[in-house]
Amino acid sequence: MAGQGDCCVKVAVRIRPQLSKEKIEGCHICTSVTPGEPQVLLGKDKAFTYDFVFDLDTWQEQIYSTCVSKLIEGCFEGYNATVLAYGQTGAGKTYTMGTGFDTVTSEEEQGIIPRAIAHLFRGIDERKRRAQEKGVTGPEFKVSAQFLELYNEEILDLFDSTRDPDARHRRSNIKIHEDANGGIYTTGVTSRLINSQEELIQCLKQGALSRTTASTQMNVQSSRSHAIFTIHLCQMRVCAQPDLVNETVTGLPDGAAPTGTEYETLTAKFHFVDLAGSERLKRTGATGERAKEGISINCGLLALGNVISALGDQSKKVVHVPYRDSKLTRLLQDSLGGNSQTIMIACVSPSDRDFMETLNTLKYANRARNIKNKVVVNQDKTSQQISALRAEIARLQMELMEYKAGKRVIGEDGTEGYSDLFRENAMLQKENGALRLRVKAMQEAIDAINNRVTQLMSQEANLLLAKAGDGNEAIGALIQNYIREIEELRTKLLESEAMNESLRRSLSRASARNPYSLGASPAGPAFGGSPATSMEDASEVIRKAKQDLERLKKKEVRQRRKSPEKEAFKKRAKLQAENSEETDENEAEEEEEERDESGCEEEEGREDEDEDSGSEESLVDSDSDPEEKEVNFQADLADLTCEIEIKQKLIDELENSQRRLQTLKHQYEEKLILLQNKIRDTQLERDRVLQNLSTMECYTEEKANKIKADYEKRLREMNRDLQKLQAAQKEHARLLKNQSRYERELKKLQAEVAEMKKAKVALMKQMREEQQRRRLVETKRNREIAQLKKEQRRQEFQIRALESQKRQQEIVLRRKTQEVSALRRLAKPMSERVAGRVGLKPPNMDSGAEVSASTTSSEAESGARSVSSIVRQWNRKIDHFLGDRPTATVNGGRPARKKFQKKGASQSFSKAARLKWQSLERRIIDIVMQRMTIVNLEADMERLIKKREELFLLQEALRRKREHLQAESPEEEKGLQELAEEIEVLAANIDYINDSITDCQATIVQLEETKEELDSTDTSVVISSCSLAEARLLLDNFLKASIDKGLQVAQKEAQIRLLEGRLRQTDMTGSSQNHLLLDALREKAEAHPELQALIYNVQHENGYASTDEEVSEFSEGSFSQSFTMKGSTSHDDFKFKGEPKLSAQMKAVSAECLGPPLDSSTKNITKSLASLVEIKEDGVGFSIRDPYYRDKVSRTVSLPTRGSTFPRQSRGATDTSPLTRRKSYDRGQPIRSTDMGFTPPSSPPTRPRNDRNVFSRLTSNQSQGSALDKSDDSDSSLSEVLRGIITPIGGAKGARTAPLQCISMAEGHTKPILCLDATDELLFTGSKDRSCKMWNLVTGQEIAALKGHPNNVVSIKYCSHSGLVFSVSSSYIKVWDIRDSAKCIRTLTSSGQVISGDACIATSTRAITSAQGEHQINQMALSPSGSMLYVASGNAVRIWELNRFQPIGKLTGHIGPVMCLTVTQTSNQHDLVVTGSKDHYVKMFQLGDCVTGTIGPTHNFEPPHYDGIECLAIQGDILFSGSRDNGIKKWDLDQQELIQQIPNAHKDWVCALAFVPGRPMLLSACRAGFIKVWNVDNFTPIGEIKGHDSPINAICTNSKHIFTASSDCRVKLWNYVPGLTPCLPRRVLAIKGRAPPCPDLPPPPLTLPILPFPVFPPPRSELLLHVT
């Protein structure tokens, strides 16, 4: 076929501009284009190279002219073409292709298809017009179009007007077929014949509007189908005749058509493919029909990607190309790997939120570059045959011409070859070029020598002048210029003389050869012979010269036969070189030969004969001497060659002279005729004058004089004209002379310019080569660096994989060890009592317990036989597989030891198969881990992008607020400045998020490169190298692995269902308990208004309207208790815990109902509830003041909160392993019928230290930071029935060595206490239970509870000047007025807003996150005067003026969140603020009289701590700082320097610092619960005491006591014991109860009746308990 060839699919990348929405949301551009190179960079350093790359500012016209214009021109030559637009949804594919006609577009915004249509019809008109101008038959064109839509894998015809647009899901009748040549065509498709551009545009618009589009979250008008617009072009034109045929065969001029006109038919089709965008359902938000469309689109694109991967496989491993997997790939089979010129335009988005889609699109397009198409011209068979024959004729004609010209010859053996003349000509041309180079080099050497001579002569002249004493630089320069000019003139003079001599000799030769040329003078025929005679003579001379030349050629042939050919070539070259040096002798010989030719021809003939005979004689004489013979031959041959050349030159000159003679002849004849006419006119004038003179009758003297004067005047005028003409002639001669000189100079300058250009070209070429070499070296180095980086990443990845594998193995080993130990315990013999207890089975166990027990037993049994059975099964399979017969089993089914024969082949087989399976397993693990990593990184990037969008919206709102404030009150500088600061903070956060997004993108790119490396090691190599037996073994392993994974999934699902069932059951139990409690309290509340008010508050807070309402919430206590009940498998535990906890709670309530009436004089609800303190049952009493029982009772009356979550303690308690249950089961606790002792629960365990790097904590979100991590996922009830009380504690004997003595303990909070503040009369505490309590230190009672906080209360302060209490929770500061029933009067926010009243009153559940634009407040401090409030929020401290409740400034300078601060006053009554942050630094801020705006730190204390700062304390000029690095530092505020530091002051975080009242002693408390006393002066320890079993969160003092708040929900009051020496720490035992018993005795037990059947809650009327 004509024009066959391979061409690769070209790929262009277009980066669309950012949308306004993306700019508003703060999306950054993650792509960049290398200037001048078709390369696009994604992220930081991931580069992709394509054929074309178009950046953001590229116009439609540029894309079309660069990519598609050549394809349209190719269609006119019969080549198919395809343009594909690929990319994600909203990347600009439809806009680029130009199929979106839903809006009016300008001409500049027209896409590829409208421009291609215009180009097509413009080309048709141009070709018709060109043919008309040449006068040949114009081509005929036929254009047709089709428009197909692939919707949900169904082909729809968009030109079919009869199709129902709503019936898209019906099957269409369009079929795809393949012709004999592999071309794809469709049947059942409407094909419209097109006659004009407007008609085709209208068809395109009609089809585009019929295309399926819909709206998604990513694009308002999203294409929901693939569209293929096809243009078919059929062209019939006159066959183009080759130039060789026109000139040599037909004899017609080029371009003229021959008489027999032949036509050829060309066809072409052009596909314009607008693919639908690749989608992610979670980004498009598609559901229902849109989701199905997206799935279909992605399936088609996946099939297209598989085809591209198969075609672009460089290793050529893929034999089958899956074209039939999708109708899309079937339709595009021509375009991908077939007969088509294809270009793919990949449209991508530059925004970083589309990073993954952009990366996938670029990788997709990069694979398409490797596809090679086989492009041929689509001709009919007749035209193809004619073209082939015409090409054959042209080739034969060219070969014939070469034979005629002597270029080709036929050897004796019949082989073709080139003639000697052709080879000689080529050799001479090469030699001529070498001589030219030599002449050029010599000329340069001459110029250099001339410059050197000039320089030397000038130096000589300068020396002479210097000796004469007249030396001067100007004179020397002038002399040098003169000498240079003299040398140049001398050189030109020599050249002119040589040229003059050459011309003179040429003229003498011409005059000697052509004596008749003198007769052709302008004098006319009178001075020579006739012109005809001279012409005949010249012709005769030429004829004779040609004869002479033929004779010499024959002589040379004879000589050549006698001399070897090789030596002749060498001698001729040598003689020609010598000939150039002996010019004078040759010229003399030429003159003699010319004279001989022009003088006497007969004598010349005789001389020639004599020369021939002489040469023959010399040849005969030289036969005796071979060397002389050879030399003579070569000399004669060279002479003949030179003579032939001279004769040839003479003949050429004669012919030229002949032509010049003819020209002169014509000129002289014309001039002669002109002169003859002039003579004739003069004679006529003379005759006329004579006639007039004769006829004159009266001739007077006067008239004669007049005539004479006229003639003289005319003569003078003619003489004057003659002089002018002569002057003009001289001027003309001078100009001609100057012109020749100018021409010589011009030629010389042109030659110099040409040489300079050549030198420039050589230098440019050298520079380009050097640059290319440097680029190659740099590319190689970069490739090596990238390879090393990849190797490093691969090794790191392998290390991580090995570490993970090791951890997994350790976990599996630990689990197996536990199973083995459990099985061993099961195998131990049991006592009869235990065995009997095991035999007992509870009659009605709940479903959860049954499932748990069955699961446990099945796990135990399966664990006992899992290892051995798997090993036996595996051995049997291997034995059966290898052909070994198993031996008999002995000892109850245990296989006996087999005697295997030694078979090296089987051993090697098993080892090779095992190695292959291990390699495949490692590969699978690597792929899974890598994909998990990529998915996690994508999730992180999406989360960061969403966070950035939120911050941008907030920033935009603040900007609008600032603009509004500027417009309304421009003088409000304070508010504007605060808004500007907040905007700056948001901008900093956005920059940090952008950096994090960039890091995620870089990591994803690195992982993708590693993924490509893993993909390169294809598992098909391992699988293809397997034998049949190995393949079976691998298949068996895969089957086992899949079964194991399925089993794990089923177990996880069963666990989830079990937990869901427990959750529902707990929900129902809690609901019923709450209803019963409310009903019981309502009955009791009829006589007690206080209880009625409490019940009303509880219902209002928790949303209970009536007892009939179904409640889905559940309490913390019921959740943990029900889990405990279900988790126990012991019979004892079941008998105790099988009775629902509701019964105990109902017993408590009923006992209260049946007890003695309350004292009527007691009106306080606290006193009324205090009657519930003593509850007796079965003759045994217990005190609710005991924290354990009090906690149980408090849970009884606590009601759930909506939206509550499971507490950590309950989650930890419920997750009891079967092993733990088995331990309790095996121990077999005895049943006690009379009493059952309880031990108080241990304190909550201390929090484990965060193992993260401290610097990573600094960069964490500031809103998540809080002092001592005071955040809890759990929630508690807002309603507390019991009020707190301060219980005095008697000092234990032998406690005299402790520096502190605990005197009282305050209890009342249900969660850890995080903060406290105290005066001499009042104590304020804040807890994780979202409440604050106010205590009366005089009476030891709780005064009020300040509730309604959104989260943990992390800081509380009391202002004695104003009587206000400030409490901090989340991002809010509540201001309480305790003088007026303790109500919240204002709410301050971290952003500086002031809200009247309680802004959190509607918050019934725990708020885990802060509001938008707010930050977590970690601590606050009051100024000593009480007029300023300093609030640490984020990495700044906001200053509030309490007189107006307005923010007036900010303290900035920290990088991390500010965790603590303290305030003191300087000598000039100015506030001095010291802050500590997570960035390890302590900063000091000294404030002046006017505090406004942003204030920077006065001093940064160096060196910093090794971790975050937790607490600060100031006494005088001494500052103490405690840190998470377990150390305390002592600073001097005056000198602003470090005095002393103790690195390990505690074994855990230093959480609180304070001073002993009235003494120079420092108190420090840590997270381990220890309190240390230090001497302030020398910073030495005085004593240590174990203050709490849980972390101590805060410490404060008043004038008498020391208060410590701990996570054990208690506040202890301490007194300092004076006069003690440093001692070892001792444990402080908290004695519970008003009448404290012995500390070592357990609390009074609670006895419950043992029932042989499960206890269910009785009806309400039967809720009776007897108190004994």
UniProtKB/Swiss-Prot annotation:
Region (Interaction with TRIM3): 401-1100
Acidic residues biased stretches: 579-628
Disulfide bonds: none
Residues at which ATP binds: 87-94
Alphabetized GO MF terms: ATP binding; microtubule binding; microtubule motor activity
WD repeat spans: 1308-1345, 1348-1386, 1412-1450, 1453-1495, 1504-1541, 1545-1584, 1587-1624
Localisation per UniProt entry: Cytoplasm, Cytoskeleton; Cell projection, Dendrite; Cell projection, Growth cone; Cell projection, Axon
PTM annotation (Phosphoserine): residues: 580, 1150, 1168, 1217, 1243
Residue ranges occupied by any Kinesin motor domain in the UniProt entry: 8-371
GO biological process, one term: regulation of postsynaptic membrane neurotransmitter receptor levels
PROSITE patterns found in the cross-reference section: KINESIN_MOTOR_1 (PS00411), KINESIN_MOTOR_2 (PS50067), WD_REPEATS_1 (PS00678), WD_REPEATS_2 (PS50082), WD_REPEATS_REGION (PS50294)
SMART domains: KISc, WD40
Disordered, as annotated region: 553-629, 837-866, 1199-1253
Residue positions where Phosphothreonine is found in the record: 583, 1239
Biological role: Plus-end directed microtubule-dependent motor protein which displays processive activity. Is involved in regulation of microtubule dynamics, synapse function and neuronal morphology, including dendritic tree branching and spine formation. Plays a role in lerning and memory. Involved in delivery of gamma-aminobutyric acid (GABA(A)) receptor to cell surface.
Subunit structure: Interacts with TRIM3; the interaction positively affects motility of KIF21B. Interacts with GABARAP and GABA(A) receptor subunits: GABRG2, GABRA1 and GABRA2. May interact with GABA(A) receptor subunits: GABRB2 and GABRB3.
The protein's name: Kinesin-like protein KIF21B
Organism: Mus musculus
Lineage: Eukaryota, Metazoa, Chordata, Craniata, Vertebrata
